[in-house]
Amino acid sequence: MAAKLDSQLLGLVFQSRPDILKGIQEAADSPARIDLFNNIASFVYERIADNTSEEPATKRRRVEAQTSGPNGAAHPIAGSQAAVLGADAAAAEPVLLEIKDISVSVPQRKKYDLCFTKNFLYARASGSPVPVQGIVYPWKDIEHAFYLPVPDKSQVQHNYVLLPRNSYLPTTKSQQSADQQTQQQTSAPLEPLVFTIPSTAPKPGTITGPSAAAAAPVSDSYATLFHWALTTSLHAAGNHACELVSSDPKVFHSVARQAYRPQEKAVHVKAFRGSKDGFLFFLPTGILWGFKKPLLFLPLDKIVAISYTSVLQRTFNIVVELEGGGEGSEEGGQEIEFSMLDQEDYAGIDQSYVRRHGLADRSMAEQRKAKKQLAENAKKAAANGEEGEGGEGGEAGDGLTELERAQKEEEQRLQDEEDEEEEDYDPGSEGESEGSGSSSEEEEEEEDGEGEGDEDDDEDMGEGLEGEE
């Protein structure tokens, strides 16, 4: 069997020096040289791993935090072995679809080629054969995906936001310490991925790979192309829980006119989180704050209540209370505050979004969680091919699906609770006036008793008179 260059290992070792990599490929013209280059790459790779583990902790943290990538671009690296293994696994799979020259803003701000494989989405520098470490996403780990307009731009642009597991909720100090201990045993959580597309169609030669022919009918615009590619890849990898959600003016839109596109309804509001400015998007599935790091997404089922503070003539603040750490957790819920919202949007946020979703009332939080659990159970049942009572699709004799029946049962339970509260209602607890009413009833009963006694006396007197006659 002819010797072959270990392109994967060489790519990892010489990722920042594509010129050396190219020279090796040109010089590898004999089996002896191929073995030599492979041995050199293996030796260098082992030395890098050994040096990383033997460095003092303070120096290692500094180096692992940031390093120089291709073309001098700084990015978080593979000091972590898990990141290297993730990149290796992605690089080992054949690229099904590649879309070139896409502007990525999170976790790094740079143009990359986005590659779609069976199990991964990753970015790689133009001309490089290996993924950029830290921008490798298993399809199964992506929990939320959004398609949102980019604010404050004269040209129409949109951001795709992909949120992997454990990447979008704020963490408390106790959670951070627990996460650090977990990360020592497992891989560190991925950062969100945000990339921007224009409203134009892709240029010729931008789309390559075996699936390029299948993508041709949906390549009239970047939006239709990525919608198809993301949805198809998620479903093919077995991730049916994640759906691509777009902003909807019917769900929420700002009344403030946009400076750059005044004829277009803005589906965002400007807001600060601490000293950082950003944009709040009120979406069908939750509230997203972007597009600066760290991004936040607050799902509806995690929100306990929303309240308002510092309501002034021109601005107000919004406070989102999140549920605690779950069952058995002693830690209370978090409160996330966004400040300096425009007063013009107060009514729209409160009426069109907060009250419509029952977010102003803490008592609705359990119902939202119950509905989510019911929906997840229904999806699991459908995925496992389970059938409900009465036949296919989880339908029983009432013609309802499992989810509809569960929601109906939940509504009935709430109604029963209200009925029980009405039955337990004690009129005597409302004040002295109710007590006096009870006294008057007793007096009436006494009077009735006296009246009956008088009638008896009259009868006795009548009998006595008859006897005398």
Swiss-Prot record:
Protein name: Histone chaperone rtt-106
Function: Histones H3 and H4 chaperone involved in the nucleosome formation and heterochromatin silencing. Required for the deposition of H3K56ac-carrying H3-H4 complex onto newly-replicated DNA. Plays a role in the transcriptional regulation of the cell-cycle dependent histone genes by creating a repressive structure at the core histone gene promoter.
Cross-referenced SUPFAM superfamilies: PH domain-like
Gene name of the record: rtt-106
Amino acid composition bias (Acidic residues), ranges on this chain: 416-433, 440-469
UniProt KW keywords: Chaperone, Chromosome, DNA-binding, Nucleus, Transcription, Transcription regulation
Localization: Nucleus; Chromosome
Assembly: Interacts with histones H3 and H4.
One GO cellular component, as annotated: chromosome
Comp. bias (Basic and acidic residues): 364-379, 402-415
Ranges where the record places region Disordered: 54-73, 364-469
Family, similarity comment: Belongs to the RTT106 family.
InterPro entries the UniProt entry points to: PH-like_dom_sf, RTT106/SPT16-like_middle_dom, RTT106/SSRP1_HistChap/FACT
Pfam family, one: Rttp106-like_middle
GO molecular function: DNA binding; histone binding; nucleosome binding
Lineage of source species: Eukaryota, Fungi, Dikarya, Ascomycota, Pezizomycotina
